[in-house]
Amino acid sequence: LAAVDCSEYPKPACTLEYRPLCGSDSKTYGNKCNFCNAVVESNGTLTLSHFGKC
C-alpha cells in the first residue's frame, strides 16, 4: 500500500515540481505538496491510490 507523510502540511504554496500522484478520487495531483494540501482539505478522507498519473 502506497503512503505519503503529510504531517508537515498544509503549506501556503507548492512548487511546480512535477512528480504526479494519483488520489483515491481518481484525480492526478502534480506533486506531494498539492496532494497533501488536498488531503488536509478533505479531513483525511482522500488517500493515495498510487504514485504516477491516474
Swiss-Prot record:
Compartments where located: Secreted
GO cellular component, one term: extracellular region
SMART domains in alphabetical order: KAZAL
A Pfam cross-reference name: Kazal_1
GO MF term set: serine-type endopeptidase inhibitor activity
Keywords: Disulfide bond, Glycoprotein, Protease inhibitor, Repeat, Secreted, Serine protease inhibitor
Residues carrying a glycan: 43
Ranges for domain Kazal-like: 4-54
Residues carrying the site annotation Reactive bond 3: 16-17
Disulfide-linked positions: 6-36, 14-33, 22-54
Entry keyword Glycoprotein: yes
Keyword Glycoprotein: yes
InterPro entries for this protein: Bifunctional_prot_inhibitor, Kazal_dom, Kazal_dom_sf, Prot_inh_Kazal-m
Domain description: Avian ovomucoid consists of three homologous, tandem Kazal family inhibitory domains.
PANTHER family: OVOMUCOID-LIKE-RELATED, SERINE PEPTIDASE INHIBITOR, KAZAL TYPE 2, TANDEM DUPLICATE 1-RELATED
Name of the protein this chain belongs to: Ovomucoid
Record organism: Alectoris chukar
Lineage, uppermost ranks: Eukaryota, Metazoa, Chordata, Craniata, Vertebrata
